[in-house]
């Protein structure tokens, strides 16, 4: 909850008890995009790039799934609201302080899943054959990068909610602005 112009706002559409598992599983479906793009382009280099992309995405999904288990075991719930409320008392209750190794593993896996440096080998722009998007240009090429940036936002929100207190206010900064600042920090 946060207050905006005197009104208390609860920015929750639905509080499902397996919310974090649902978000991670929907994110894992994203590996079908590169696989189907490489297969449907009818190019052997795109198919090899798709196989490379799927193997990298699958390997880092395992790391991100296992690293998120430590905060889940501390909180005792998969609900994103419960994880947020667990860290609500002060900044020192954030799970980054009790689980720094899990945070680093999840951060590295998040960088790898979103193709950020140094894990941008899947469609590196300096290569002539740029992975599974070799045959795509224009709007289709742009849709892959819109999806990549949407994945960056979702990973940043997960990191902010699970490890950095979520929607809880930081001192004089209200909760809604605080989470946007945290997400912006991890995106840039």
Regions found by a protein language model. Give the residues of each.
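Selective transmembrane helix interface/packing segments
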Residues: 1-188
């Amino acid at each position: 909850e946060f207050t905006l112009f005197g009104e208390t706002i609860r920015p929750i559409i639905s509080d499902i008890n397996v919310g974090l598992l649902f978000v991670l599983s929907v994110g894992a479906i994203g590996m079908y995009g590169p696989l189907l793009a490489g297969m449907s382009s009818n190019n052997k280099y795109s198919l090899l790039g798709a196989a490379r992309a799927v193997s990298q995405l699958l390997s880092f999904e395992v790391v991100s799934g296992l690293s998120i288990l430590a905060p889940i075991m501390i909180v005792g719930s998969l609900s994103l609201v419960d994880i947020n409320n667990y860290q609500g008392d002060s900044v020192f209750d954030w799970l980054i302080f009790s689980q720094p190794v899990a945070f680093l593993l999840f951060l590295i896996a998040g960088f790898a899943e979103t193709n950020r440096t140094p894990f941008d080998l899947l469609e590196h722009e300096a290569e002539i054959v740029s992975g599974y998007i070799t045959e795509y240009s224009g709007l289709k090429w742009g849709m892959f990068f819109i999806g990549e940036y949407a994945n960056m936002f979702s990973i940043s929100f997960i990191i902010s909610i699970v490890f950095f207190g979520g929607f809880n206010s930081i001192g004089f900064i209200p909760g809604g602005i605080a989470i946007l600042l945290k997400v912006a920090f991890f995106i840039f």
